[in-house]
A protein has these predicted regions:
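Beta-strand->loop->alpha-helix junctions that form or flank phosphate-binding loops
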Residues: 7-10, 61-63
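Residue-level detector of flexible, active-site-proximal loop/helix-junction positions
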Residues: 10-12, 39, 66, 117
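Short, small-residue-biased leader/transition segments that mark boundaries at the very start
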Residues: 1-6
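Internal alpha-helical scaffold of NAD(P)-dependent oxidoreductase catalytic cores
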Residues: 24-111
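Glycine-/Pro-rich loop/turn segments that contact NAD(P) or position catalytic residues
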Residues: 10-27, 33
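Long, positively charged, glycine-interspersed low-complexity recognition regions
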Residues: 167-179
């Protein structure tokens, strides 16, 4: 008899690790993604949905391809970008550590998840490597386009990029009113 397995992903977390940093409030209202296979029995899916609801999470059932691409874009690659940001700043900081001294809101916001568990994130990245690689390729292309336009001092390019990003980011508030 074949065993059934349902992949799940609680969309909640922190850069802090260990039991001493655990908190039940972190999952309250968070999305809980359930990715069944074609063989998964409906009652197993319902069990997982009920479990998620019982612990205060919002269950969402989706195809695993959609899940893998989505979490690569909204979680896995941002963790890698945060890590890359910290590496670039660290490599460019001077002996007096002026960059470290001046690091404030933007840098702190964007670098927070770089303090996450290296072991856990290595496993996550290796497990979802194909989707992550596809999203990273898009970032590389976008960064090259941004660099080209900044080098050329293209009028309006940077403003339009920020405007589009601001609109999408602000639209998240309607999807996540609790944050």
């Amino acid at each position: 008899q074949r065993q059934m397995c349902i992949r799940d992903s609680p969309m909640a977390g922190s850069e802090k690790t260990g039991y001493e940093n655990s908190s039940s409030s972190i999952i309250k209202g968070a999305r809980y993604i359930i990715t069944p296979t074609k063989e998964t029995k409906p009652e197993k899916i319902e069990f997982m949905k009920q479990f998620a609801s019982d612990v205060g999470m919002n269950p969402i059932v989706m195809d695993y391809h959609v899940h893998d691409k989505s979490v690569a874009a909204i979680s896995h690659v941002p963790h890698l970008l945060s890590t890359a940001l910290v590496h670039v700043v660290s490599d460019n900081d001077d002996e007096e550590k002026h960059m470290q001294l001046l690091a404030a809101g933007c840098f702190r916001d964007m670098s927070r998840v770089a303090a996450s568990s290296p072991e856990m994130w290595e496993q996550i990245c290796l497990t979802n490597s194909s989707a992550i690689s596809n999203i990273l390729e898009q970032y590389i292309e976008m960064l090259e386009t941004i660099k080209d336009n900044i080098d050329k001092k293209t009028p309006g390019y940077v403003a339009s990029l920020f405007e589009m990003s601001r609109e999408y980011r602000n639209s998240l508030e309607s999807r996540h009113p609790e944050h």
